[in-house]
Amino acid sequence: MTGKKRSASSSRWLQEHFSDKYVQQAQKKGLRSRAWFKLDEIQQSDKLFKPGMTVVDLGAAPGGWSQYVVTQIGGKGRIIACDLLPMDPIVGVDFLQGDFRDELVMKALLERVGDSKVQVVMSDMAPNMSGTPAVDIPRAMYLVELALEMCRDVLAPGGSFVVKVFQGEGFDEYLREIRSLFTKVKVRKPDSSRARSREVYIVATGRKP
């Protein structure tokens, strides 16, 4: 019985996924994921990326955000990306495969950043979802806290942070924490984000010294 329900649910998800206009556009444009459009919307409203910037991309695979940012920062820019999953190479992207929660992976990532002045940290990280908010939300909040810790370590004064967050327990406290570190903070729900999803994007600019 459970198997049948799961099968029906999977079928509905696949039908929704492939009929999604952003999925279709991504396929036509040869993009790695529909996430490309989310970041494009954020860039149109918040102008985060400029030529020559150094950007850290957390939760990068399959590469939609890195693929987008390469077009914005140009050949003199640099992207340092990390994900637990493998990612096909992108010119201009230094990719590290590993679990961001692992201290050794974090250390390796910081070594790759080195003395670079990072202007943007972006995180599209999400845990494997169980479908139970009481389990999923704390897991997701742990990841976004780690992303904010990365900001504290590498983000230059005046820099920006964009992070996917799932609304639920801990969201308001996290938002307050970000407001204490940045001069301007917005919560965005891009049109390309599925309406039924709890996800929103916090866009924080002007990191305080």
Swiss-Prot record:
Function as written in the Swiss-Prot or TrEMBL entry: Specifically methylates the uridine in position 2552 of 23S rRNA at the 2'-O position of the ribose in the fully assembled 50S ribosomal subunit.
Entry superkingdom: Bacteria
UniProt protein name: Ribosomal RNA large subunit methyltransferase E
One Pfam family cited in the UniProt record for this chain: FtsJ
Cellular-component GO terms for this entry: cytosol
Phenotype when changing Y201A: 5-fold decrease in activity. Almost no change in S-adenosyl-L-methionine binding
Residues involved in S-adenosyl-L-methionine binding: G63, W65, D83, D99, D124
Expression induction or repression: By heat shock.
One annotated GO biological process: RNA methylation
Disruption phenotype: Cells lacking this gene show a dramatically altered ribosome profile, a severe growth disadvantage, and a temperature-sensitive phenotype. These effects are overcome by overexpressing either of 2 small GTPases, ObgE/CgtA or EngA.
HAMAP family from the UniProt entry: RNA_methyltr_E (MF_01547)
Effect of R34A: 4-fold decrease in activity and increase in Km for 50S subunit
